UniProtKB/Swiss-Prot annotation:
Tissues in which the UniProt entry reports expression: Expressed in a wide variety of tissues, with highest levels in the testis and ovary.
In-chain residues carrying the UniProt-annotated modification N-acetylmethionine: M1
Name of the molecule in the record: Apoptosis regulator BAX
One Pfam family this sequence matches: Bcl-2
Assembly and interaction partners: Homodimer. Forms higher oligomers under stress conditions. Forms heterooligomers with BAK. Interacts with BCL2L11. Interaction with BCL2L11 promotes BAX oligomerization and association with mitochondrial membranes, with subsequent release of cytochrome c. Forms heterodimers with BCL2, E1B 19K protein, BCL2L1 isoform Bcl-X(L), BCL2L2, MCL1 and A1. Interacts with SH3GLB1. Interacts with SFN and YWHAZ; the interaction occurs in the cytoplasm. Under stress conditions, JNK-mediated phosphorylation of SFN and YWHAZ, releases BAX to mitochondria.
GO terms (BP aspect): apoptotic mitochondrial changes; apoptotic process; apoptotic process involved in blood vessel morphogenesis; apoptotic process involved in embryonic digit morphogenesis; apoptotic process involved in mammary gland involution; apoptotic signaling pathway; B cell apoptotic process; B cell homeostasis
Free-text note regarding domains: Intact BH3 motif is required by BIK, BID, BAK, BAD and BAX for their pro-apoptotic activity and for their interaction with anti-apoptotic members of the Bcl-2 family.
Motif annotated as BH1, chain positions: 98-118
Stored Gene3D superfamilies: Blc2-like
Annotated gene: Bax
UniProt PTM comment: Ubiquitinated in the absence of XRCC6/Ku70. Ubiquitinated on Lys-128 and Lys-190. 'Lys-63'-linked polyubiquitin chains on Lys-128 are removed by USP12.
Free-text function comment from the UniProt entry: Accelerates programmed cell death by binding to, and antagonizing the apoptosis repressor BCL2 or its adenovirus homolog E1B 19k protein. Under stress conditions, undergoes a conformation change that causes translocation to the mitochondrion membrane, leading to the release of cytochrome c that then triggers apoptosis. Promotes activation of CASP3, and thereby apoptosis.
Organism: Rattus norvegicus
Amino acid sequence: MDGSGEQLGGGGPTSSEQIMKTGAFLLQGFIQDRAGRMAGETPELTLEQPPQDASTKKLSECLRRIGDELDSNMELQRMIADVDTDSPREVFFRVAADMFADGNFNWGRVVALFYFASKLVLKALCTKVPELIRTIMGWTLDFLRERLLVWIQDQGGWDGLLSYFGTPTWQTVTIFVAGVLTASLTIWKKMG
């Protein structure tokens, strides 16, 4: 930061380029963290990590804590385990679209999207389909760019995530995120 609220080398915190760059970094870090907890070292996920500023470290920690809470939601884990990954692209985009179908955007839903993407990546790791990993990450970033970018810009960039999750308790947040993802998976199963 140069004191003006602008981040060096990518426009301000609400520029499309900076939001996508930060989003890609957060998604990669989130997926690597989830995979590392499940499978230990995952060379398929070893990606170049740019240096983190204090804000990005806080965002990463926020996502990690929410992910830890979601991992302990057994109903959500059961539903995700039941997702058929024979056509993962269709599954991903249908669930992602269902999460935002009502036109109401919020940080809980963005985190739910990241969490769902991480679970699909972990399934790909378990089924030894490593080429699917980068593909799922690409789908997530495409969805972010096409459907969520303007909303994230309107929230002041990724720092809005910290403001959103700074007030309620973690249990409240994770119950909300788990509810969004569970509802989306339920709708997807009924339609599929």
